[in-house]
C-alpha cells in the first residue's frame, strides 16, 4: 500500500517550493490538502510514497512531476456569477462607463480556474448587448491561469450537471449552453468567441498582455503572502488603462498593500478604480 504520510520537514520544504513557484502560501496546517491533492500523482508517476514524490518535486528531478504537482495544488472549484454583485456592477456601471470611450473594451479574468468567471463575464456582455443594442463597442476577455489542465478544460467549455448547478440559472443554461451528451452541457460558440484563454503565472510580468479596462482578480490574493499581494496589485495597476477598474473577492481588501486605487462603493459591494 502506498504511504501517504509526510513529515513536518517534507511539508515545510514543499511549502517553500510552492510559494517560490506560484506565490501560494500554505501555512502551518495544510498537510491534509497536500495529501489529498498530491496522492493521486503517487500512483500516476509510479512512486513508492508521497514522501518520495515531495522530495522529487522539491529537488527538481522530474519537470513533468513538478508541473503536475503545482497544477494539482492550484486547481480550485468555483461558481457561475459568484457573489452576483460584480456582474451586476459590470453590466450597469462599468460597461456603459468604459463604452463611452468609444474604443474596444478589454477585460482580464485572472486565475480563471475552470472557466466559470470568464464565461460569466461573457454572458453578462451578451445580455447587455441584447438589452442595450449599440451601447458596446467590441469587447474581448483574456482569461489566464497557471494550470495547463484548467486551461484545457476552459477551452473545451464542457461542464457536468454538478458544475452547472453552482450559480447558473435555468434560463442562462438554456440560452448559453448546448447539449454535449452524457449529462453534460457545452458553452455555445457565441460565448466562447469572446474569451481567449492563455497561461499566466501571477508572479511573472504582465507587460506582454497589454492594457485592460477592467480586471477581475477575485478570491486569488487570499492565497498569497502580503509581499506577493502587493506585487500582484501594483503590476495590475500598471496593466490598467487610465480610470480602469479592479474587482476583488468579497472578503479581500487592498488595505496596506497598494496606494494606486481608490475605493468605489457600489451598494452592494466594493470595487477599486485606478487613481
Curated annotation (Swiss-Prot):
Keywords: Methyltransferase, S-adenosyl-L-methionine, Transferase. It comes from the Bacteria. S-adenosyl-L-methionine binds at residues 76, 78, 82, 117, 145, 201-202, 218-219. InterPro entries: Bact_Chemotaxis_MeTrfase, CheR_C, CheR_MeTrfase, CheR_N, CheR_N_sf, SAM-dependent_MTases_sf. Transmembrane segments: none annotated. It catalyses: L-glutamyl-[protein] + S-adenosyl-L-methionine = [protein]-L-glutamate 5-O-methyl ester + S-adenosyl-L-homocysteine. Pfam families: CheR, CheR_N. One of its GO terms (biological process) is methylation. Its EC number is 2.1.1.80. It is an enzyme of class 2 (transferase). Residues 1-275 form the CheR-type methyltransferase domain. Signal peptide: none annotated. GO terms for molecular function: protein-glutamate O-methyltransferase activity. Methylation of the membrane-bound methyl-accepting chemotaxis proteins (MCP) to form gamma-glutamyl methyl ester residues in MCP. PANTHER family: CHEMOTAXIS PROTEIN METHYLTRANSFERASE, CHEMOTAXIS PROTEIN METHYLTRANSFERASE 1. This is Chemotaxis protein methyltransferase. It comes from Vibrio parahaemolyticus serotype O3:K6 (strain RIMD 2210633).
